[in-house]
């Protein structure tokens, strides 16, 4: 098949990682795959095409990257499948000619919540594009709010990258790891409040933050790791026995899954997307959305109960590494497109 993805960028951040991994794996399965990416200026698109700039974080990337000044429906390549990957790319897909391929919408979050005008974003979900979503929560939203069917393909963890790293826990310190992000809906404020409540009774527990950038203000992280390369993330996840996810809403949530694959016990809000892997009392402890007191209580349980912590970590690791697999996911993606 000839397959075209419209990707917002090729950085490792956010949902682009899944988009480009699928593009690479489909190309490795013998398909002719093009990823069309907008540049801010026409001259940038020109030089990036000349230099064949692609995602250098995927060794030997097999798909073709085509840089453009903007997504022009009339200039999209002829293909069998054309895939929008965010709400801003949907208009180009919807208006593309028939020879651009069967039209799909790869949905990785309910973007109406935080990304763009809600009415405009919602209008994209109502369009008659075949939908692929990354969680059961998103499938429910598509069905209940828009009367639209969707195929669920949970994004797997890369087991070659994310696994327990021997020697990472070089001391007996009990570390809680949390992603730091400027988006309010990532729940940093709620996470800090929950951690502060636990530290009143357990001051020995250490809060470890990580993120693309350091926080602008002084926050109570005992450690902070800035913009770690992906090969070092497994070490950080493995170093911290507990992963705290205070996000209000997630399309899926890859960092919690990566931490689980590295042997961390997960404590999380019920953020929607986590329901495919965070099974309360089995693979994680789950608190009601934005209920800081409940999140603190769950965190304290994992801090004080070593047997519970180890059981959640073991079951969580087994679940995310056996239930979701990249080879199977690429095969299913291929089947949906065909």
PLM features: residue spans?
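Aromatic "clamp/platform" in nucleotide-sugar-dependent glycosyltransferases that forms part
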Residues: 248
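Conserved acidic donor-binding segment of nucleotide-sugar-dependent glycosyltransferases
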Residues: 227, 280-281, 285-292, 301-307
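Short hydrophobic beta-strand element within catalytic cores of glycosyltransferases
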Residues: 265-268
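Acidic anion/phosphate-binding donor-loop and adjacent secondary structure
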Residues: 112-118, 144, 151-172
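Conserved donor-binding/catalytic core segment of Leloir-type glycosyltransferases
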Residues: 4, 132, 168-186, 192-197
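Short alpha-helical donor nucleotide-sugar binding micro-motif in glycosyltransferases
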Residues: 236-240
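A short, well-ordered alpha-helix in the C-terminal region of glycosyltransferases
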Residues: 294, 301, 308-322, 332-335
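Short glycine/serine-rich donor-binding loops of glycosyltransferases
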Residues: 253-256, 274
């Amino acid at each position: 098949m000839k397959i075209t993805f419209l990707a917002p960028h090729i950085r490792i951040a956010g949902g682009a990682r899944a988009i480009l991994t699928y593009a690479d794996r489909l190309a490795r399965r013998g398909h002719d795959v093009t990823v069309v990416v907008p540049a801010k200026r026409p001259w940038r698109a020109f030089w990036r095409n000349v230099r064949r700039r692609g995602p250098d974080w995927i060794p030997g990337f097999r798909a073709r990257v085509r840089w453009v000044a903007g997504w022009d429906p009339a200039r999209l390549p002829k293909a069998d499948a054309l895939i929008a990957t965010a709400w801003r790319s949907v208009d180009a897909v919807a208006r593309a000619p028939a020879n651009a391929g069967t039209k799909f919408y790869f949905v990785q979050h309910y973007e109406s919540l935080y990304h763009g005008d809600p009415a405009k974003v919602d209008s994209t979900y109502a369009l008659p594009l075949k939908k692929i979503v990354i969680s059961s929560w998103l499938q429910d939203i598509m069905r209940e709010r828009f009367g639209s069917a969707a195929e669920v393909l949970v994004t797997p963890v890369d087991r070659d990258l994310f696994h327990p790293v021997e020697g990472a826990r070089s001391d007996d310190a009990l570390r809680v790891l949390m992603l730091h992000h400027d988006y309010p809906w990532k729940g940093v404020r709620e996470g800090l409040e929950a951690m502060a409540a636990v530290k009143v009774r357990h001051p020995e527990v250490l809060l470890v933050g990580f993120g693309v950038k350091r926080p602008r203000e002084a926050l109570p992280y005992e450690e902070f790791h800035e913009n770690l390369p992906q090969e070092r993330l497994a070490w950080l996840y493995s170093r911290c026995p507990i992963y705290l996810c205070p996000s209000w809403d997630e399309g899926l949530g890859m960092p919690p899954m990566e931490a689980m694959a590295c042997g961390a016990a997960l404590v999380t809000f019920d953020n929607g997307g986590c329901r495919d892997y965070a099974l309360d009392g089995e693979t994680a402890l789950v608190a009601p959305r934005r209920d800081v007191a409940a999140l603190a209580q769950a965190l304290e349980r994992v801090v004080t109960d070593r047997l519970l912590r180890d059981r959640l970590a073991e079951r969580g690791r087994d679940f995310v590494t056996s239930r979701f697999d990249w080879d199977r996911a690429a095969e299913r993606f291929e089947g949906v497109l065909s």
